[in-house]
Amino acid sequence: MTTFPPKLPAPKEFSALNRPEQLEVLRRANARQKLRLLVEAAAGEELLALLPPQDVYLLARELGPDQIPELLTMASPEQWTAFFDFDCWDGDTLGRLSARKWLAILLQGEAPWVAKTLQELDFELLVLMVLREVQVVSGPEEMADEDVMAENRRRECGYVLDYRDEDGAKLFGGLIDVLFRYAPEFCRYLLEAVRSEGESLLEESVYQQRGGRLLDQGLPEPYAAQTVYAWLDPESFVVSGESKRPLGASAIGVAPGAALQLASPRGVLAEVLGAGVDGQTAWELTCLLNKVMMAEKIDLGDLDAVRGLGERSYALLNLALEYLAGSNATAAARCLQTAYAEQLFRLGHSLTLRLQRRARAVREAAVGAYLDGPYRQLTDALLQRPPQFAEVLVRPERGGRRLFASLREVRLTEEWLDRLEAQCRLFEEHFPFPLPSVDDWALAGCHPGHGRELTLSAIFLTALANRLLERPFAPQPLAAGELSVLHALVSRGGNVNPELRAQTLSWLASLEPGGSAFGAFCLDLWEEEFCKVRTAELDPRYVGGLIVRLAAAL
């Protein structure tokens, strides 16, 4: 069982464990713990070879591959092929310099091990790496002089080679030398392949084979990975009681743990993972994280990006579990055991996507250009990719946004959207004036001076002010000289007249269920920015919640 955070035995205790127990400990260990256990273990090389290639790769990336040659020179050929698969491609192009970096580390091993590992790498991948760096000028059959032929057979397998540059000559000359000394027939076979292959077709073939190997690790093509974001209706989601089918290598391989350790779960998910998960669930979670990384086209070696996507994936899983099981960790664990992790991820994502769709509909409506500050922050956060929680909902003094941490935040956001949609209906269906576009307001000589500076609260309060001044309910600018008259009608002891507040809220509630919340929001603004200002100190340039025509423009 994988637990978070890991509790590991001392090295002596680790050596006394049987093989499955040792592998389970390694699965739970962080990078430095894993390195220490593997290096000190008597069967470290055997244990390392059993670990999933991605776990070994992430360990190397976290600690620095050039810092742990003693470990990487124990890695299996399958793991080495994975290092090149994970770290040496830019789209469908093999990166020459990144391949050099890994080959340089490989060549630090003992020569017999290097030769054996090179022979067991994916052959076409090895040919492509050499082809990028080495030109075979001629082979043994082209040498007429027997003395020259004999000399060349003693070095570089009898071939005349040109290298891309001096550094490449040192690296690939060393590679060919090792192969010639310990596997001469393979060396000749490799150079003949380099001599005969076309680079473009070979690279395409290697790229396709790489895709198959990545898929075995739960890493699909980026286009196919987009299905991880497919909509799943929360209202109709049901956890199936049927047995789950093992994913990818989970049926035969050692379960991974490195990717799961990079991020920290929260909420009920943290309780579930803290109690431990079995190998099948560890595979599912890793495959899910991998699919999200591929969908986002994240470099698998960019640990900060991987960690960020891990936090995001855990956050959405937590939303799904809270939606299905509340805070009951036992029920949540049952959901994780009976529903695929990807289904739960899609459920959590859909809970936030549903909020985003509502926010987008409001922003595309006529009111969208005039949202007041908190509501604009709300919709701005929801329109991010992925949808995010606006902190102004819980801390009015803050304006940040972050991932949704709990279902409570989803529910709070829904409540704010309910209020925002009520505002939309008030303006679109009930108020007796249309909302023009921001460029169609005639505000020359007014404060605010342009439609883009207006908010729904200012538009409503200006219309209400006109009504109190016995004019039609419409957002026509007030004359600066009318502010003192309005102040006397609205203010009582620095607060909004309680009778006016009650009447206004009752009227809005009669027009639209939930409309009174908008009225309360607007009157609170009036109370702070208008009522608390003494009449003698009213300055039309600084009065909030009203459209005022300045005296100088009259």
Where are these regions (language model features)?
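General marker for long, soluble alpha-helical cores
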Residues: 1-74, 78-554
